[in-house]
């Protein structure tokens, strides 16, 4: 069920930030966000609970925390400006909210890239009912 909602949200929001986040992930990991990160572990995808399963899942936990810190922003739909220079993502634009969203997405994409060696296929489409450990706080 969680996977269905993730795909539905991603399809509805393709004009917005989620498509941009997918592109950043592709740049940093050479993987498509769907299916690689759309329902990975306890935090990648819609919602999150429990303890992150590994370093990749922790990237998603930190990304969720980053979004939570944004006030008066719409991180799942706002579009932002960014460029790529020598393999480095540069967030741009004059809107502070959109720039912060971009920085959250950039940090997660970089984190995914840095943790490719520990990525575990067994955590793809991980059922959230198995995320029973006490949740961490941001």
From Swiss-Prot:
Active site feature: 63, 105
Catalytic activity: a 1,2-diacyl-sn-glycero-3-phosphocholine + H2O = a 1-acyl-sn-glycero-3-phosphocholine + a fatty acid + H(+)
Annotated Gene Ontology cellular component terms: extracellular region
GO molecular function, one term: calcium-dependent phospholipase A2 activity
Localization in the cell: Secreted
Principal EC category: hydrolase
EC number(s) on file: 3.1.1.4
Cofactor: Ca(2+)
Keywords: Calcium, Disulfide bond, Hydrolase, Lipid degradation, Lipid metabolism, Metal-binding, Myotoxin, Neurotoxin, Presynaptic neurotoxin, Secreted, Signal, Toxin
Protein origin, superkingdom: Eukaryota
InterPro entries (alphabetical): PLipase_A2, PLipase_A2_Asp_AS, PLipase_A2_dom, PLipase_A2_dom_sf, PLipase_A2_His_AS
Cofactor binding annotation: Binds 1 Ca(2+) ion.
Tissue localization of expression: Expressed by the venom gland.
One biological process term in Gene Ontology: lipid catabolic process
Cleavable signal peptide: 1-16
Pfam families: Phospholip_A2_1
Chain residues that bind Ca(2+): 43, 45, 47, 64
Disulfide bond positions: 42-131, 44-60, 59-111, 65-138, 66-104, 73-97, 91-102
Family classification: Belongs to the phospholipase A2 family. Group II subfamily. D49 sub-subfamily.
PANTHER family, sorted: PHOSPHOLIPASE A2 FAMILY MEMBER, PHOSPHOLIPASE A2, MEMBRANE ASSOCIATED
Protein name: Basic phospholipase A2 Sct-N6
Organism: Sistrurus tergeminus
């Amino acid at each position: 069920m969680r996977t269905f909602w993730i795909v539905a949200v991603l399809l509805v929001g393709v004009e917005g930030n989620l498509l941009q986040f997918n592109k950043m992930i592709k740049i940093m990991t050479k993987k498509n966000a769907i299916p690689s990160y759309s329902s990975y572990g306890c935090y990648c995808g819609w919602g999150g609970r429990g303890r992150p399963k590994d370093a990749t899942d922790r990237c998603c936990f930190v990304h969720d925390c980053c979004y939570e810190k944004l006030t008066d922003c719409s991180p799942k739909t706002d579009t932002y400006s960014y460029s790529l220079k020598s393999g480095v993502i540069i967030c741009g634009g004059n809107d502070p909210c959109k720039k912060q969203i971009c920085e959250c997405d950039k940090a997660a994409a970089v984190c995914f890239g840095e943790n490719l060696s520990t990525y575990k296929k067994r955590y793809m489409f991980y059922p959230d009912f198995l995320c029973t450990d006490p949740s961490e706080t941001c």
